[in-house]
Curated annotation (Swiss-Prot):
GO biological process, any: peptidoglycan biosynthetic process
Subcellular location, record wording: Cell inner membrane
Assigned EC number: 2.4.1.227
Record membrane topology: Peripheral membrane protein
Gene Ontology MF terms: UDP-N-acetyl-D-glucosamine:N-acetylmuramoyl-L-alanyl-D-glutamyl-meso-2,6-diaminopimelyl-D-alanyl-D-alanine-diphosphoundecaprenol 4-beta-N-acetylglucosaminlytransferase activity; undecaprenyldiphospho-muramoylpentapeptide beta-N-acetylglucosaminyltransferase activity
Enzyme kind, highest EC tier: transferase
Catalyzed reactions: di-trans,octa-cis-undecaprenyl diphospho-N-acetyl-alpha-D-muramoyl-L-alanyl-D-glutamyl-meso-2,6-diaminopimeloyl-D-alanyl-D-alanine + UDP-N-acetyl-alpha-D-glucosamine = di-trans,octa-cis-undecaprenyl diphospho-[N-acetyl-alpha-D-glucosaminyl-(1->4)]-N-acetyl-alpha-D-muramoyl-L-alanyl-D-glutamyl-meso-2,6-diaminopimeloyl-D-alanyl-D-alanine + UDP + H(+)
Organism encoding this protein: Vibrio cholerae serotype O1 (strain ATCC 39541 / Classical Ogawa 395 / O395)
Protein name: UDP-N-acetylglucosamine--N-acetylmuramyl-(pentapeptide) pyrophosphoryl-undecaprenol N-acetylglucosamine transferase
Role according to the record: Cell wall formation. Catalyzes the transfer of a GlcNAc subunit on undecaprenyl-pyrophosphoryl-MurNAc-pentapeptide (lipid intermediate I) to form undecaprenyl-pyrophosphoryl-MurNAc-(pentapeptide)GlcNAc (lipid intermediate II).
InterPro entries: GlcNAc_MurG, Glyco_trans_28_C, GlycoTrans_28_N
Amino acid sequence: MMNKNKKLMVMAGGTGGHVFPGLAVAKQLQQQGWQIRWLGTADRMEAELVPKHGIEIDFIQVKGLRGQGLMRLLKAPFQIVNAILQARRHLLAYQPDAVLGMGGYVSGPGGIAAWLMGIPVVLHEQNAVAGLTNQWLAKIARRVFQAFPGAFADAPVVGNPVRQDVVQLAAPEQRFATRNGAIRILVMGGSQGARILNQTLPAVMAALGEGYEIRHQAGKNSQQDVAEAYAAAGVESAQVTEFIDDVADAYAWADLLICRSGALTVSEVSAAGVGAIFIPFMHKDRQQALNADHLVACGAAKMIEQPDLSVEKLTQMVRELDRAQLLSMAQKARQAAKLDADKVVAQAIIAITE
């Protein structure tokens, strides 16, 4: 059924973990005739990324409050009210039938403005621990979804919306069927890279010796330094890039992934069907570690928390994984995947606007 006159405003920004899932839901609704517009901030990645996907974007001025000085905190109430008023102006101009909050600072003012105007709010929490913005918005949202158990007590667990090129990868047993020789390791630290991975992996690869290939996504402005670190460690064959444009192709190539455990990364690893060693980013609420827990528990992944990370420990963990174990991990990852989150969230939006 087509919904040619229906409009959605997506509210998401800051990181790919918020923006890419929002784009996946938007694409589902566009295929059913919906018009999509975005609410974001002008100085974060959505400003450049969203228009590349053919979606117009409006901007508000808003920043986070965590870790700010006293003057910022004193000004915060006025800045929040101003951001809500800015969001309200954009909502009045666009007149959406619903708004979708995917997290990031922009979701708070946008969601409150929509609620005050009587526009239905649908919320999706990507992490196993709900962010402050989504904790607030969950109290006023018409529907709330979570990617992993634990963010909310009674919200449906639907996984994270994942890009279709990742979902459509061949099954692990097909990809691994003809592989022999060097084990392929893919290192990913997110769009900004991960300093701890950049510092540790060259020494790990040197210690592993022959029998391994590596592709390493170093992050913004780190490619040269990381490439030089591999060369200094005697690892001449490392392929180091700043950013990976075709993530699906990289997952398809890999036998093993070594990475952070941001929400979208964990969901993509599972959807792709690749075994992983997660090195969670250190945070007081252990958000990234909790994101990865379910894949570790089912045997699809291993985890080393950052305080426990050493060259020796990671080297030993990689050495212990042979091809049979890597295939088993990949299969368990794919079996644990929830592949229809974008469809479930899109259908909920359609249902509340009928």
